[in-house]
Amino acid sequence: MQLGLDFSLVEELVAGVDEVGRGPLCGAVVTAAVILDPLRPIIGLNDSKKLTEARREVLFDEIREKALAWCIARAEVEEIDRLNILHATMLAMQRAVEGLSVTPKLALIDGNRCPRLTVPSAPVVKGDSRVPAIAAASILAKVSRDREMLEMDRLYPGYGIAGHKGYPTPVHLEALQRLGPTPIHRRSFAPVRALLEPVAVDCIAATV
């Protein structure tokens, strides 16, 4: 359901929850939950996608310093492949809320559905541009995942991960065709699965 209130006025132990990384072909899906401190306002909170990288980095530190509580969580590639991306995202959101050092009275979830939580929750469509706490969560999740993708680029050179962050760009798809999937690629996603299926067929044929 959508709450009938001015989201910008929601304060007092309300956690904002968001995710980054549902669409990429590789890497974990990363989530964050944030309870802002109304006595320590943070200027310039907005959907992380609408901010420059430099601004996100500044806000990342400020959010962690000023928030009443925050937690960054994740679901790994293996969980995404086993559960599917939707259920893995819900699991990661659940972990983020449960990892808060302060129990919120309400969790506002970006999007149109909520994970199973032990506290009341409500979805907020486009919440990262409507609810400051969700915007803060989106910033923590995006900066964390982007940093991880830079490290993955060093571990798996040639795929351009630092640039596309795992999303299915032409550069990424061409590298997949040329180099094959890495251990961090999501086997359940169609472009990766399509590259692995001929291998499975060949293995079956070889045993006949």
From Swiss-Prot:
What is the name attached to this protein's record?
A: Ribonuclease HII
Task: Tell me where in this chain the RNase H type-2 domain is found.
Answer: 12-201
For the keyword Manganese, the answer is: yes
Its gene name is rnhB
Give this protein's Gene Ontology molecular function annotations: manganese ion binding; RNA binding; RNA-DNA hybrid ribonuclease activity
**What does the similarity note say?**
Belongs to the RNase HII family.
Q: Where in the cell is it found?
A: Cytoplasm
| One annotated Gene Ontology cellular component of this protein | ribonuclease H2 complex
Q: Where is this protein chiefly located?
A: cytoplasm
Cofactor(s) needed by this chain: Mn(2+); Mg(2+)
Note accompanying the cofactor annotation? Manganese or magnesium. Binds 1 divalent metal ion per monomer in the absence of substrate. May bind a second metal ion after substrate binding.
Q: Which domain of life is it from?
A: Bacteria
- Assigned EC number: 3.1.26.4
Give the organism the record lists: Ectopseudomonas mendocina (strain ymp) (Pseudomonas mendocina)
Where a divalent metal cation binds, per the record, is at: 18-19, 110
Q: Which Pfam families match?
A: RNase_HII
Q: Write the record's keywords in alphabetical order, separated by commas.
A: Cytoplasm, Endonuclease, Hydrolase, Manganese, Metal-binding, Nuclease
Q: Which InterPro entries match?
A: RNase_HII, RNase_HII/HIII, RNase_HII/HIII_dom, RNaseH-like_sf, RNaseH_sf
The protein's enzyme class: hydrolase
Query: What is known about what this protein does?
Result: Endonuclease that specifically degrades the RNA of RNA-DNA hybrids.
Q: A GO term (biological process) for this protein?
A: mismatch repair
